[in-house]
Amino acid sequence: MVRVTDVPRYVIAADAACAALEGGAVVLHMGTKRYYSLNETGARVWQLLEEGTSERDAAARLVDDYQVDPSEANAAVLQLLAELLAEGLVEARPR
């Protein structure tokens, strides 16, 4: 059984900055000077992370906001988090 304390909390990295654009957002990793683009749903997940929303709650919000299947929303959030984590744009911290 997975305990809540075993699941990391994802937070925006200190050296990541985001600017909203029409239909998405652009994220700058200030350490590497690399830019990344997010589509509309990716930008929504980023916004939710900035608000301190958990990955599970972010997926639930995507279901509400975009009327998508819960398993699809969960998979999309986890995939985005994995990519952001790999690029150093978010950090996984213990709860």
Predicted regions and their residues:
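Long, charge-rich, low-complexity alpha-helical segments
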Residues: 21, 34-95
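Long, low-complexity, charged/polar intrinsically disordered regions in eukaryotic proteins
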Residues: 1-25
